[in-house]
Amino acid sequence: MPLLRFDLIEGRDQSSLKKLLDVAHNVVVEAFDVPQQDRYQIVHEHPENHMIIEDTGLGFNRTKNLVVLSVTSKSRPEEKKQKFYRLLAERLESECGIASTDLIVSIVENDNADWSFGLGEAQFLTGKL
């Protein structure tokens, strides 16, 4: 159950935003082997001057198409994370026109006790999930 939070510069139209979210979800399903209906995405849009995202010395420029993706997830093997990064960059570029240099991903891991999907229960601990 990854939770994806997207920080974007405001101005994308609804169809572009939907495509971005759909592509990201399909990559999560493929790379992390989660069920199709396991979809949790939140979008935060910011004025351009509210995001200062540089290249960390890698030598490229960012554009207004910038996507900063924070993923909260249970622990995943390194190879699945690498697959996620690669597929996401490839598909956002090919399907959404977002350059791989405009993608930043951070994965924060947590454990089964850190999730409740409602009803005041930790369903991963109770066995309901």
Swiss-Prot record:
Gene3D superfamilies: Macrophage Migration Inhibitory Factor (3.30.429.10). It comes from the Bacteria. One of its GO terms (molecular function) is isomerase activity. The keyword Isomerase applies. Keywords: Isomerase. SUPFAM superfamilies: Tautomerase/MIF (SSF55331). It is an enzyme of class 5 (isomerase). Pfam families: Tautomerase_2 (PF14552). InterPro entries: Tauto_MSAD, Tautomerase/MIF_sf. Its EC number is 5.3.2.-. The active site is at residue 2. PANTHER family: TAUTOMERASE YOLI-RELATED. Putative target of GltR. Belongs to the 4-oxalocrotonate tautomerase family. This is Probable tautomerase YrdN. The lineage of its organism: Bacteria, Bacillati, Bacillota, Bacilli, Bacillales.
